[in-house]
Amino acid sequence: MQEKLQAIVAQAKETIHSVSELVHLDEIRVQYLGKKGELTAMMKTLGQLSAEERPKAGQIINEAKQSVQTFLSEKKAELEDAILAAKLAGETIDVSLPGRGLDTGGLHPVTRTLRRIETIFSKAGFDVATGPEIEDDWHNFEALNIPETHPARAMHDTFYFDENTVLRTHTSGVQIRTMEEKDAPMRIIAPGRVYRCDSDQTHTPMFHQVEGLIIEENTSFAQLRTLIIEFLRQFFEDENLKVRFRPSYFPFTEPSAEVDIATNLFGDGRWIEVLGCGMVHPNVLKNVDVDSEKYTGLAFGLGVERLAMLRYGVTDLRQFFENDLRFLKQFK
């Protein structure tokens, strides 16, 4: 019996060693250790032995079964390791391959421009003030020395809710509200959305504006001129930027001026208007109970989209509001 068991174990070892797939390994287990397996059949022959021989024979058969089970376990572990190694080899990361970057978003060019403007003026001591976009007649017109006969009040220029309520046409109303609520001296800028009945290559019904106000003693137009030139040169990062002031008219400032810069945006070095400014009209100060004998004011207003167009080389203002990602992704 012992010789037969040794032959079975040797054959099992050889067969197991030659297996290359787990499914075949299970077939071999059934062949030797299953209910009808060769070693199981050997156990059934113990009844043919004498009582003295059975313990020794049973021990030998069990040792043979354990040997075969050990071969099977070792081979199974070997095959599983090979399968895992092959899988890992197929999934190896090539660290020399450039990573795939996330498609991150970015600030809208108008937002970037607004933040740039706020940063520059904050360095000059200006606070940021805000106010409602739906404005009453007093804050949008009357307090700013704009009479009922002024063209800006016309229906084709202003969006009316009723005869006394409008979508604000400028952020100057924020200046009025601030002067009503706070005492001079003050320096503020009022950024925000404004609305006018206008739409073409350089105008949209809704756009962004920043208006600035200084109420202090002994202000002068020379101070205003220096402030604006310095702002424009910082904004465009050009210390040699050409800036000119032209006499103009605004109901809420006197004297008033429009400011142009020389630009090659259209390829011809033309002068482009970028903002309006002036000394705050005494009537405006009177309307908000500011002592015009003690204080004088400087005011300016600029279109954010206009500055964004000039800074980024955009020739059609409407592109800022069409939500075309091909356009907007340029400004990340």
UniProtKB/Swiss-Prot annotation:
Binds 2 magnesium ions per tetramer. It comes from the Bacteria. Mg(2+) binds at residue 254. Its EC number is 6.1.1.20. SUPFAM superfamilies: Class II aaRS and biotin synthetases, tRNA-binding arm. Gene3D superfamilies: Bira Bifunctional Protein, Domain 2 (3.30.930.10). InterPro entries: aa-tRNA-synth_II (IPR006195), aa-tRNA-synth_II/BPL/LPL (IPR045864), Phe-tRNA-synth_IIc_asu (IPR004529), Phe-tRNA_ligase_II_N (IPR004188), Phe_tRNA_ligase_alpha1_bac (IPR022911), Phenylalanyl-tRNA_Synthase (IPR002319), tRNA-bd_arm (IPR010978). One of its GO terms (biological process) is phenylalanyl-tRNA aminoacylation. Transmembrane segments: none annotated. Pfam families: Phe_tRNA-synt_N, tRNA-synt_2d. GO terms for molecular function: ATP binding; magnesium ion binding; phenylalanine-tRNA ligase activity; tRNA binding. It is an enzyme of class 6 (ligase). GO terms for cellular component: cytoplasm. Keywords: Aminoacyl-tRNA synthetase, ATP-binding, Cytoplasm, Ligase, Magnesium, Metal-binding, Nucleotide-binding, Protein biosynthesis. It is found in: Cytoplasm. Its cofactor is Mg(2+). It catalyses: tRNA(Phe) + L-phenylalanine + ATP = L-phenylalanyl-tRNA(Phe) + AMP + diphosphate + H(+). PANTHER family: PHENYLALANINE--TRNA LIGASE, MITOCHONDRIAL, PHENYLALANYL-TRNA SYNTHETASE. Tetramer of two alpha and two beta subunits. Belongs to the class-II aminoacyl-tRNA synthetase family. Phe-tRNA synthetase alpha subunit type 1 subfamily. This is Phenylalanine--tRNA ligase alpha subunit.
